[in-house]
């Protein structure tokens, strides 16, 4: 997801309130929008990513920060851009109009004037009112929005670039489970009203993130069918919610309309609501797989293509799919699935078939260069019980992505030797296949025989030209979540 916040415990309202936002605005059905995250050890080159977007009909892209390479690549492409101001800058921007003006100059004005980037909006913060933040950004968010708006006006961009705040669905709730009873969370009700009023008065819009997958992840008793969009003509699931004359057959509609009811209740129903993130991961959890992701996202694209909205907002909103690509350097604090939200793999290959706008099929990235066809695996004569292996595997997974080894994941059924080989290879590929990255106490060897098996794919990393990269300097230190992931694996090799 956009933020690293841990998944929140859900009350009864989880069935209607645990979704991430989709952009709601009139647009032709052939127009699609996607989140382009860049937290990867080997990011797909900007020009390749832009070509991938255009080949598949995406004409809007959302960036979580003003990534220079991504923004330059988006110049003169016709793709409309939402650029993010990260949470860590909220306090400084809130406290100084000058800081806001400097940020706008460096990250908005310059890219519009020098590179021809079609920046249409600035996302101030990302889910700043999450309960898990315990109010950390509440005082700074609205002043930051006001200062960024003032900076855009001063730069002559007040009509061209609009301000928004992407919010998590935990900012509103329904105490009895009916969308019509929706209201803002009591502790931030006044803040939400003031924020939305400012956005409405200044031509901005509201962005909401909705994740049906998280409803299922957070509650083992959540009705599975309610997480998906029902197929046309199919009977409603038993979990459907009756709200007066309206029957809600899926959690997205119920969640979105809970927000709309909250806005209407406070006289703010005129605000445009954009869904900033919605999607389904393909790995890292028993419910995160390609089949489930294909089912959910195809239902989503079918809704977009049909222009079908929700009972309270019949016109389908703009939807920023989360995400375009996998990101192997993201925090896994929310869960091991966090690195696997992409519709495309890290290299731009589709994970599953999809019918996009106008019935077109999903297309892979073009012009991707790969490293040599070789892998690092456990040496055949090495014993899995070698005492040096636990430390070697732990080190490999500290600096590379081993989330696919978790229970219920794509590589969760490997035997001990293959588990170790997978960890070794992930580190080897992340280090650009440097020979010394396959030197685990003489327990590993480089092979040209593909060790992939079943659903578990042993990667060959894309070639970014950065052959002096060392993984230890490029990856974040091991988190508690990573350590917990490794415990079952390490127990096998101790």
What positions do the PLM features span?
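Generic structural signal for hydrophobic
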Residues: 52-53, 73-74, 111-114, 199, ...
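Substrate-binding cleft of extracellular glycoside hydrolase catalytic domains
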Residues: 70-171, 177-187, 275
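Acidic-and-aromatic substrate-binding clefts and catalytic sites of carbohydrate-active enzymes
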Residues: 40-44, 59-72, 89-100, 130-131, ...
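Boundary/entry segment of secreted carbohydrate-active catalytic domains
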Residues: 2-62, 370
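Hydrophobic faces of well-ordered beta-strands that scaffold small-molecule active sites
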Residues: 32-36, 59-63, 81-85, 120-124, ...
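Substrate-binding and catalytic surfaces of secreted/luminal carbohydrate-active proteins
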Residues: 50, 146-150, 157-165, 172, ...
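Cleavable C-terminal sorting propeptides in eukaryotic secreted/cell-surface proteins
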Residues: 470-494
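Short, acidic/polar
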Residues: 37-52, 98-112, 189-193, 303, ...
């Amino acid at each position: 997801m956009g933020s690293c916040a841990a998944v929140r415990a859900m009350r009864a309202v989880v069935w209607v309130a645990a979704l991430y936002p989709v952009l709601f605005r009139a647009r032709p059905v052939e127009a699609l929008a996607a989140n382009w995250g860049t937290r990867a050890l080997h990011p797909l080159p900007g020009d390749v990513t832009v070509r991938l977007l255009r080949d598949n009909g995406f004409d809007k892209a959302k960036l979580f920060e003003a990534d220079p390479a991504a923004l330059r690549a988006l110049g003169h492409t016709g793709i409309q851009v939402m650029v993010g101001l990260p949470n860590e800058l909220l306090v400084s921007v809130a406290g100084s109009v000058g800081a806001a003006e400097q940020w706008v100059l460096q990250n908005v004005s310059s890219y519009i004037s020098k590179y021809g980037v079609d920046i249409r909006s600035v996302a101030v913060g990302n889910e700043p009112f999450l309960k898990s933040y315990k109010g950390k950004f509440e005082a700074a968010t609205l002043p930051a929005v006001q200062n960024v708006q003032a900076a855009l006006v001063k730069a002559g961009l007040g009509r061209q670039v609009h301000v928004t705040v992407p919010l998590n669905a935990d900012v509103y709730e329904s105490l009895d489970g009916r969308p019509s009873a929706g209201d803002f969370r009591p502790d931030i009700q006044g803040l939400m009203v003031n924020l939305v009023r400012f956005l409405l008065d200044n031509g901005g819009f509201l962005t909401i993130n909705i994740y049906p997958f998280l409803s299922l992840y957070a509650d083992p008793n959540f009705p599975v069918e309610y997480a998906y969009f029902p197929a046309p003509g199919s009977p409603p699931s038993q979990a459907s919610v009756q709200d007066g004359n309206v029957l809600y057959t899926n959690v997205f509609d119920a969640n979105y309309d809970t927000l709309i009811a909250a806005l209407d209740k406070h006289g703010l129903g005129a605000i445009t609501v954009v869904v900033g993130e919605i999607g389904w991961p393909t790995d890292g959890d028993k419910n995160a797989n390609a089949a489930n992701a294909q089912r959910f996202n195809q239902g989503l694209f079918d809704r977009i293509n049909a222009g079908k909205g929700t009972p309270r907002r019949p016109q389908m909103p703009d939807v920023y799919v989360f995400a375009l690509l996998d990101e192997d350097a993201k925090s896994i604090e929310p869960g091991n699935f966090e690195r696997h939200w992409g519709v495309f793999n890290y290299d731009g290959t589709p994970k599953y078939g999809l019918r996009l706008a106008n019935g077109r099929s999903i297309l892979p990235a073009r012009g991707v260069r790969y490293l040599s066809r070789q892998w690092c695996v456990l040496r055949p004569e090495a014993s899995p019980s070698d005492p040096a292996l636990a430390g070697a595997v732990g080190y490999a997974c500290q600096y590379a992505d081993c989330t696919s080894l978790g229970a219920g994941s794509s590589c969760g059924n490997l035997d001990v030797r293959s588990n170790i080989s997978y960890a070794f290879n992930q580190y080897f590929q992340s280090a650009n296949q440097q020979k010394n990255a396959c030197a685990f106490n003489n327990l590993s060897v480089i092979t040209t025989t593909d060790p992939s098996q079943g659903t578990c794919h042993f990667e060959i990393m894309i070639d970014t030209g950065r052959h002096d990269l060392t993984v230890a300097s490029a990856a974040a230190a091991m988190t508690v979540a990573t350590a917990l992931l490794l415990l079952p694996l390490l127990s096998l090799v101790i």
